[in-house]
C-alpha cells in the first residue's frame, strides 16, 4: 500500500527559502548607500538595456538583485501604483515607505501562496523633498516579504559578506559623491575578488550607477554616465586611495 507524499509546512518553507536564496546569490551584487547629497546606487551589470536600478517616483528610487523578469515585473507594478496614487491624491502622498510596504505584501503573498517564490531582493530608497532636511531612507525587502529599514547602506545579490565587511570598514557618513562612489566600487571589487579572485574584472563597463540627488527640485533620480564614471574609477585605480577631492560636477555628467 502506497502512502501519499507529505511534507510539513516547516519543511516547505525551508525549501522555498533555500530556492530563493540560491537564486539571489547567483545574481550580480548591488550596493545602495547614503551619501551627503542623497542616495547612491551601484550595481554589477554588464547589460546596457536590462537595468537593475530605476526611478519609481519623484523622490523614490529602486534597485534589485535576482531574476530580472521577476524584479522587473515588481518595478513596473511599483511605478504604476505610484503614478496612480500621485494622480488621484497628491504627489507628496507617494513615499518610499509606502512603496516598500506594497512590495513586502506582494512578495509575502507570493512566497506563501504561489508554487514558487520570487528569487529577488529589493531596495527602495527615498530622499527628502527639495528644501527639506529629512535624512534619506533605505528599505530592504526580501523574497519572503520581510522588510527592514537600513540607516547607511544595503547590499544585495552575489557574494554579500565580503562586500558588507568592506563597507563596514570604509563607509563614511556625509561622504561626497566622489568618495561614496569609490567606497561602493571598492566594496564590490572585494566581493568580485572573493568570488573569482580578480578585482580588475569589475570595470566601468560592467557597472550601472545612479543617484537620488536631494538637491534637485523635483525628480531626484539621475544616472551617472560612462565618461563621468570612467573619470572616477581612473583616479581610484591610479591613486589607490579615496582622496579628498570634491565631487565631480554633474552638469552633462548624468542622464535621466
From Swiss-Prot:
The keyword Transmembrane helix does not apply. Keywords: Cytoplasm, Proteasome. It holds the Pfam family Proteasome. This is Proteasome subunit alpha. GO terms for biological process: modification-dependent protein catabolic process; proteasomal protein catabolic process. Belongs to the peptidase T1A family. Gene3D superfamilies: Glutamine Phosphoribosylpyrophosphate, subunit 1, domain 1 (3.60.20.10). The lineage of its organism: Bacteria, Bacillati, Actinomycetota, Actinomycetes, Mycobacteriales. The formation of the proteasomal ATPase ARC-20S proteasome complex, likely via the docking of the C-termini of ARC into the intersubunit pockets in the alpha-rings, may trigger opening of the gate for substrate entry. Interconversion between the open-gate and close-gate conformations leads to a dynamic regulation of the 20S proteasome proteolysis activity. The 20S proteasome core is composed of 14 alpha and 14 beta subunits that assemble into four stacked heptameric rings, resulting in a barrel-shaped structure. The two inner rings, each composed of seven catalytic beta subunits, are sandwiched by two outer rings, each composed of seven alpha subunits. The catalytic chamber with the active sites is on the inside of the barrel. Has a gated structure, the ends of the cylinder being occluded by the N-termini of the alpha-subunits. Is capped by the proteasome-associated ATPase, ARC. One of its GO terms (cellular component) is proteasome core complex, alpha-subunit complex. Pathway: Protein degradation; proteasomal Pup-dependent pathway. Its main location: cytoplasm. GO terms for molecular function: threonine-type endopeptidase activity.
Amino acid at each position: 500500500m502506497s502512502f501519499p507524499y507529505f511534507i510539513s509546512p516547516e519543511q516547505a518553507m525551508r525549501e522555498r527559502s533555500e530556492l530563493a536564496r540560491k537564486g539571489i546569490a547567483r545574481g550580480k551584487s548591488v550596493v545602495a548607500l547614503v551619501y551627503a547629497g542623497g542616495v547612491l546606487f551601484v550595481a554589477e551589470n554588464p547589460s546596457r538595456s536590462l537595468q537593475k536600478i530605476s526611478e519609481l517616483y519623484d523622490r523614490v528610487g529602486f534597485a534589485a538583485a535576482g531574476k530580472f523578469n521577476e524584479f522587473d515585473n515588481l518595478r513596473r507594478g511599483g511605478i504604476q501604483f505610484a503614478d496612480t496614487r500621485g494622480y488621484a491624491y497628491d504627489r507628496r502622498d507617494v513615499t518610499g515607505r509606502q512603496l516598500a510596504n506594497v512590495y513586502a505584501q506582494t512578495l509575502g503573498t507570493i512566497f506563501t501562496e504561489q508554487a514558487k517564490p520570487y528569487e529577488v531582493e529589493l531596495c527602495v530608497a527615498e530622499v527628502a523633498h527639495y528644501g527639506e532636511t529629512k535624512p534619506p531612507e533605505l528599505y530592504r525587502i526580501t523574497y519572503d516579504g520581510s522588510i527592514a529599514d537600513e540607516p547607511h547602506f544595503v547590499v544585495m545579490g552575489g557574494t554579500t559578506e565580503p562586500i558588507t565587511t568592506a563597507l563596514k570598514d570604509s563607509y563614511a557618513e556625509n561622504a561626497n559623491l566622489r568618495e561614496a562612489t569609490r567606497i561602493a566600487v571598492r566594496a564590490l571589487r572585494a566581493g568580485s575578488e572573493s568570488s573569482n579572485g580578480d578585482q580588475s574584472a569589475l570595470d566601468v563597463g560592467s557597472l550601472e550607477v545612479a543617484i537620488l540627488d536631494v538637491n534637485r527640485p523635483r525628480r531626484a533620480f539621475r544616472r551617472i554616465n560612462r565618461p563621468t564614471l570612467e573619470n572616477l574609477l581612473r583616479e581610484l585605480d591610479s591613486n589607490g586611495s579615496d582622496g579628498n577631492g570634491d565631487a565631480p560636477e554633474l552638469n552633462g555628467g548624468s542622464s535621466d
